[in-house]
Amino acid sequence: MCGIFCSVVNNVPLNSFNISSALKVILKNRGPDVQDEVVIDYCFGKILFAGFVLWQQGESVQKQPVVEDDFIFLFNGDIYNTSKPEYMSDTTWIAERLAECRCKEQNILKILKRLEGPHCLIIYDKREQILYFSRDALGRNSLLIERICNGFQLLSTSHFEDKKISLELPPLGLFRVKLNDLNSCVLYPWQPLNNYSTQLLRNLDLAIGWKTAVESPMSPDWMLNCNPAFSYNFYEFQYIKNNVNLYKNLIDQSEIKYTLSILHTLLSDSIKNRVRNMAPFCRLCMQKLNISPPCRHAKLCILFSGGLDCTILALLANQFVPVNEPIELINVAFESVKGQNISEKLFDVPDRKTSLVSVNELKQLCPERCWNLLKVNVTRLELQQHLTSRIKHLIYPLDTVLDESLGCAFWFASHCTHSTARVALIGSGADELFGGYTRYRNSYSRCLGNDLERQLAVQNELERDWQRISARNLARDDRIIADTGKTARSPFIEENFVKFIRSLEVYQKCCFGFPEGVGDKLLLRLYGYQIGLRDVVFLKKRAIQFGSRIANKKQNGSHQSDNL
C-alpha cells in the first residue's frame, strides 16, 4: 500500500508550496519504505507530486512519483491480471504501458479497461497539461479530493481540519482536468451512471467548484453481464428441519454443487493472488537491510473475529502460504467495563470466545500450520487517546458513530505490536454479497406481499448496500489499515467473484425461511461446510463493533460521532 499526493495550485510562490508536517507523517505511515517529491510548473501555477511507498511487489522497491519525458505517474494498489514478470512491480508495468502509448488519452482508457485489482492512480500529461485520476470501479482503495485556495488536491488520506472541504473521490471512472481550466472536468465512467452515482457526481461538482461532463462508458470486460441461469431455490428446502441434514442435502444437489465449485475456484484464485503477491520480508526483517530472503516469519495476517467469513479466508489461505511460515489471526477486544484493575476477564468479549472456537477448528483441519492467535486488548483509556491523536484523522472525512467504531476496531487490530505481517486479509463484502446483515431478514419478514415481492425487497436492500459499500466501508478501512504499514486485501471483493455472486438470484444466496445462523449467507455457509468447517458455519452473524464490545447497541450508528 502506498500514500500518494498531488496538489494543483494557481499563483503560488514556490517556497510556500509543500506538504504540512502532520499530513506527511500520515502519508509516510502508509508508505514507510521510500518517499519522494516533485514540483513542476504549469501554465498558471505549480503541481506538487509526492509518493510514499510500501514495498509489496517486484525485486526491489519502486520509487514514486515515476517521472518520464511525457508524464508523471502515481499509483497505489495491486493489479492481478497482468502478464508482468515477477521481478516487476505493478507501478513499473503500468508506467511502461503509458510510455509506450506516449500517454495518449484513448490509450490510457484502453489500459484502464484491462486492469483488475484494487487501485487508484494519478497521471499527468506534461505536453497537454492534463491531469487524469481514478479509483477502481469497486472503490477498494482510498483517494480523497480536497478543495484548497486557488486549486485542489488528491491524496490517499488526509488530516482533519475544521472548515476544510474534503470528500472521498467517487469511484465512477477516469476523471480528466485540463489545468488551464480548473472550472471544468470530464468523466469517462466505468459504466452508465444511475441515480446514486449521478448524485455522487453532483456532490463532487458542488464541493470542488467545477462542472463535470460525462463521456461514453469504458465498460471493462469483467462488468459485462454474467447469466449462469441456475434454477435451484433454497426456499424449496424449508421442509428440512435438522440443520446438518439440510446442509448435507443441499450440497448433494447437482446445481448447488456446481455453484459451489465455481465459488471455490474464483475465491481460491482471489486469495492466491492476494497471498502470493507480497514482498519476501516480514515487517521486522524489512528493517534489516543485510538479511537475505527467505524470511520465515509471518507475512500474512487475517483480522479474525472467528466468524464465518474470516475463518474461510484463513482455511483457504493455508494452501498458498509456505508450510513453515506462521499465519497470524488477530483478534481485538475492548475493555467491557470501566475500572482501574485490568484483568483478562474484562476482555472476554463475544468475538474473543468465537475466535478460540474457530482457531481450534483450523488447527484440527490444518495441524501442520502454526496458527498464531494474537489477542489485542484495548482499554478505554487507550481507545480515547489514540482516537483523538490519530484514528480520527484516518476516518476523516467520514464522521458517524459507526465509522468511529469500525475504524477503531480495525486500527487496533492491524496495529498489533506483536504482528510481523505486512498484508492483512479482511472479510469485507461477504455480508453484502451473500445476504448476511439482519436488515435483509427484516426486509423479508416486514414485506406484506407475496414471496416474489419479499425476494424483491431483499434484492433492493442488497443492491442499495452494494452501491454504497465503498463510501460506507472500503475506503475508510483502507486508510485505517494502511496507517499501520499493512496492505488490506479483500478476497471477497474481486472482480470475477463479485460478478458471479451478483449474477445469482437472491434465493440462491440466502433463505430467511431458515433461522439466524442457518439461512443468512446460506450459500457461503454451505461452502464453509463443504471445505470442512463445522461449528463456525452455524454461528449467528455478529457485527465486529458489537462482538469486540467497542460499540453500545443503544447508539445509532448513523448519527454523527462526538469524537470525530
Curated annotation (Swiss-Prot):
Keywords: Amino-acid biosynthesis, Asparagine biosynthesis, Glutamine amidotransferase. The active site is at C2. It holds the Pfam family Asn_synthase. Residues 2-180 form the Glutamine amidotransferase type-2 domain. The keyword Secreted does not apply. SUPFAM superfamilies: Adenine nucleotide alpha hydrolases-like, N-terminal nucleophile aminohydrolases (Ntn hydrolases). GO terms for biological process: asparagine biosynthetic process. GO terms for molecular function: asparagine synthase (glutamine-hydrolyzing) activity. Residues 280-541 form the Asparagine synthetase domain. This is Asparagine synthetase domain-containing protein CG17486. It comes from Drosophila melanogaster (Fruit fly).
